[in-house]
Amino acid sequence: MKKYISIAIDGPSGSGKSTAAKELAKKLGFLYINTGLMYRAYAYFLSINKLDINVNEMDCINAIKNANFIFNGDNVKINDNDVSLILRSNDVAMIASVVSANEKIRDLATNEQRRIASENNVVMDGRDIGSIVLTNADLKFYLNTSIQTRAKRRLFQNKDIENLDYESIYNDIKERDHRDMTRKIAPLKKANDAVEIFNDNMKLDECVQHLYEIYLKKIKKLNF
């Protein structure tokens, strides 16, 4: 039986983990899975079918199980329909925050993520990949960035938006971190065996190269 390589990348919101994971996967020729996008896909599917996870949980679970979801990096198809762009909307993000808090939905997503990793060389990012989803991943990273740096980055990215200031962004990120780290189901947590990387002073290409070099050393030890 072929052994596939799995790389888990976790970290707080705004740490650049998704972009770094995507670029690392491209560099390695691996499949990239954005687990946050998976929850958005489930949420969008339930919303267009007028199903509410808080009203009839089992109907929602069965509907998702009977649908055909295809995840490939930033591209997502549901029953052969490309929904990649619409999943990026704020409306879908709001629904996803509710759906992803459901324990049965998380179990469903976790099983799917593990199935994908068992059939592909994969780089998977999220907040509980190394600690819960892929506990036996060949390599685990935890990308960390100070709240100050994340707030500055977000302010720069949204510089054209009026009435957006550093202090409000800082407080939003701080509150988000607290929610993610203290939530009951699948909290944000660094796996004990994860390599923690502080990327405040790194450019994207430097961060990706650093991950890549660590990967090369690890793979030599594993004799792949």
From Swiss-Prot:
NCBIfam families named in the record: cmk
Q: What is this protein called?
A: Cytidylate kinase
Task: Supply one GO molecular-function term.
Answer: CMP kinase activity
Residues reported in the UniProt entry to bind ATP: 11-19
Which branch of life, at top level?
Answer: Bacteria
- Known catalytic reactions: CMP + ATP = CDP + ADP; dCMP + ATP = dCDP + ADP
User: Is ATP-binding tagged as a keyword?
Assistant: yes
- Gene that produces this protein: cmk
GO CC annotations on file: cytoplasm
Any signal peptide, and if so, which residues?
Answer: none
Compartments, record wording: Cytoplasm
